[in-house]
Amino acid sequence: MARIGGVNVPVDKRVVVALTYIYGIGTSLANRICEGCGIDKNVRVSALSEEDVVKIRNFIRAGCVVEADLRKEVAMNIKFLMDIGCYRGLRHRKKLPVRGQRTHTNARTRKGGSRLAVAAKKK
């Protein structure tokens, strides 16, 4: 496994697909990384030379926020929303959907919590 951005990316996959295993890198950013480093998108990670891997690492380090830094940034943004007491922050605090989804019948995953016990059928 090649180690890029603190993540072991799979060797048997194409470079564009393997880069998406890194948190914060989607398909469009993976394409941009390949173009910026001058690497063919369809080549497998196992076929990359060590200097190609170093190019990719340097490109990501220079211009992308990924993995732990990105997770920390997202958590700080959510904490900021909760601290200022805006509507989105209140929804986060109550563990309800934030983006306007209905909650009367849905949102079971986000709400979590207790389930009502179903009474056993009478025979």
Swiss-Prot record:
InterPro entries from the UniProt entry: Rbsml_uS13_C (IPR027437), Ribosomal_uS13 (IPR001892), Ribosomal_uS13-like_H2TH (IPR010979), Ribosomal_uS13_bac-type (IPR019980), Ribosomal_uS13_CS (IPR018269)
Basic residues bias locations: 99-113
Keywords recorded for this protein, A-Z: Ribonucleoprotein, Ribosomal protein, RNA-binding, rRNA-binding, tRNA-binding
Lineage top rank: taxon: Bacteria
Pfam families: Ribosomal_S13
CC annotations in GO: cytosol; small ribosomal subunit
GO molecular function, one term: rRNA binding
NCBIfam families: uS13_bact
PANTHER family: 30S RIBOSOMAL PROTEIN S13/40S RIBOSOMAL PROTEIN S18 (PTHR10871), SMALL RIBOSOMAL SUBUNIT PROTEIN US13M (PTHR10871:SF1)
Family statement drawn from the similarity comment of this UniProt entry: Belongs to the universal ribosomal protein uS13 family.
Subunit text: Part of the 30S ribosomal subunit. Forms a loose heterodimer with protein S19. Forms two bridges to the 50S subunit in the 70S ribosome.
Protein name: Small ribosomal subunit protein uS13
Organism: Anaplasma phagocytophilum (strain HZ)
Organism placement in taxonomy: Bacteria, Pseudomonadati, Pseudomonadota, Alphaproteobacteria, Rickettsiales
Gene name per UniProt: rpsM
